[in-house]
UniProtKB/Swiss-Prot annotation:
Biased composition (Acidic residues): 117-130, 138-182
Residue ranges with Polar residues bias: 1-14
Record-level GO cellular component terms: nucleolus
Protein name: Putative uncharacterized protein DDB_G0270496
Origin organism lineage: Eukaryota, Amoebozoa, Evosea, Eumycetozoa, Dictyostelia
Family stated for the protein in its record: Belongs to the AATF family.
UniProt source species: Dictyostelium discoideum
Length: 523
């Protein structure tokens, strides 16, 4: 449209100039000459405009048009922007945007709203002048339509517009960032659109990437953490129970031996026998409850094979051998599960320790790289030595029904001579293992409180480093040093008074309210 308007204005001005020269001639001759000149020069002007690149003004940027009057004017610049590649694949322009593009999506010269209004006013004025001189308006309109169609075909404006629409419809999400950066940006709206598309592309890529922790993995991790917490709580409860049982074990070791057990009961009254029976019954019931609890836990575990036979129970009226046989069958049932569990967790711990040690293989010198089950089996092979360690009498205590031979033997042995270890088959003493548990408990507590203790150590060091407040101006007697004494309370200084000349008789008469005077009179 802008090209057609320019053509129309150029043609009208040229025709009016020629027409004014012919007005001096006769009326009819001037009109015929004017039409001839108009018909001749119109084709020439169109050919000149089509073949001349200087007078052609291409289409303007529609986005740069100020339709609402709220955009700033584009300032012209003499800066050289270099060559701009076709098809919108040139490099991004820096600095001021040029006022005219010869190729690309927005080809043509930029114009403001004010320039368009001025062109329309000039066009109206030229049309009025042309009507005054008798121009044929219908012919001019037809010529303008033809010229506009030719110019549109010449510049392929419609084809480019269709290509742009097709490109917008076929826009893909996997387009490279380099193509986005190379597009010529003519306004802030284009830049905002490009940034928005980049943001959408990044969000889609993030959604396609696999997540490290999904919903299912998160639930599994939470379940593992809860199980670990429960295991730690159970271990602490078992350790507390073992600590409380230590006193019971020491008391059980003081009970009379089977040889003198019957004699001990016969010498005492029936109340002692009744208490012994109650203690035995309570112990059997405790063993039975622990056995039943273990059986229920085994049934809940799917990894342990189910038992087809009827469940056995421990009753207080059973003998000691029958109770031990029932417990041994339960242990054999759990043997396979114990071995698998120990192997699995030992492998996990070994992998973790090797990772923490930097892959140096810290387990290379432990029992010649044997498995954990083989190490346990090698330890249990010497079962007699292990059993003998539990029969060692490590502390001095008196067993009921035995003579006190320890004191006499201790007095006879010299101090330099080493005492021999005393073993007793009727006692159970695992003090060495008990001390190991206590050391582990103390180490764990110290690790937990390490943060707090480290804090107090740092605070103590800071207090040591802290300088005392010293007034440097107090030297050389510049500040008086004095101490305030506390006030005296309920105290008066003595006053010296002259001794009065008292009469002794009068003094005695005044004693006890005048009673001294009565006694004197009686005498």
């Amino acid at each position: 449209m802008a090209v057609s308007k320019n053509i129309k204005s150029n043609v009208s001005t040229h025709v009016t100039k020629k027409a004014t020269k012919k007005t001096t001639n006769n009326g009819e001759e001037s009109k015929t000459v004017k039409k001839a000149v108009n018909n001749k020069l119109l084709s020439d002007e169109i050919n000149e405009i089509l073949h001349s690149s200087e007078n052609i003004k291409k289409s303007i940027d529609p986005e740069s048009m100020d339709y609402f009057g709220d955009s700033a004017k584009v300032s012209k610049s003499d800066e050289n922007f270099g060559e701009i590649e076709d098809d919108n694949r040139g490099t991004r322009l820096k600095g001021d945007i040029p006022t005219e593009f010869t190729s690309g999506k927005y080809s043509g010269k930029k114009s403001s709203r004010k320039d368009n209004d001025m062109e329309e006013d000039d066009e109206l004025d030229q049309d009025n002048e042309y009507d005054i001189f008798g121009g044929d308006k219908q012919d001019d309109d037809d010529g303008d339509d033809d010229n506009s169609e030719d110019l549109d075909d010449a510049f392929d404006f419609q084809d480019k517009q269709d290509d742009d629409d097709d490109d917008d419809d076929k826009e893909d999400d996997d387009e490279d960032d380099d193509d986005d950066e190379n597009v010529v940006v003519s306004s802030n709206i284009d830049r905002a659109d490009m940034l928005f598309k980049k943001l959408q592309k990044q969000e889609k890529e993030e959604e396609k990437q696999p997540k490290l922790v999904g919903h299912t993995n998160e639930a599994d991790e939470m379940e593992k953490a809860q199980n670990t917490k429960n295991q730690t709580a159970l271990y602490n409860e078992f350790l507390t129970t073992r600590i409380l049982l230590q006193k019971t074990i020491n008391c059980a070791n003081k009970l009379p031996k089977p040889k003198i057990y019957k004699e001990f009961l016969e010498l005492n009254d029936e109340s002692l026998q009744k208490k012994f029976k109650e203690t035995k019954t309570a112990s059997c019931l405790l063993i039975s409850e622990l056995y039943n609890l273990q059986s229920e836990l085994i049934d809940l575990n799917d990894e342990i094979p189910k038992q087809q036979q009827s469940k056995k129970r421990i009753r207080p009226d059973q003998s000691l051998s029958e109770i031990w046989n029932t417990i041994e069958e339960q242990n054999q049932r759990l043997d396979q599960f114990h071995n698998q569990t120990i192997t699995k967790w030992n492998n996990r711990i070994s992998v973790t320790s090797s990772i923490n040690s930097g892959g140096k293989g810290g387990n290379n010198l432990k029992s010649l790289n044997q498995s954990i089950l083989s190490q346990i089996q090698n330890t249990l092979n010497d079962f007699e030595r292990l059993q003998k360690r539990t029969k060692l009498k490590r502390t001095t205590y008196r067993i009921i029904g035995e003579k006190q031979q320890q004191l006499s033997s201790a007095n006879s042995i010299d101090q330099n001579e080493e005492e021999k270890d005393e073993y007793d088959d009727e006692i159970f003493d695992d003090t060495d293992f008990y001390q190991t548990l206590l050391k582990d408990l103390e180490a764990n507590n110290s690790e937990e409180n390490e943060v707090g203790s480290q804090y107090w150590i740092e605070m103590r060091n800071l207090k040591k480093k802290k300088k005392k407040k010293v007034n440097q101006k107090a030297s050389k007697g510049r500040i008086l040093r004095y101490e305030v004494f506390p006030k005296l309370e309920n105290f008066m200084t003595p006053q010296s008074l002259p001794i009065p000349d008292w009469n002794i008789d009068q003094l005695y008469q005044n004693l006890f309210g005048g009673l001294g005077n009565v006694n004197i009179n009686l005498n």
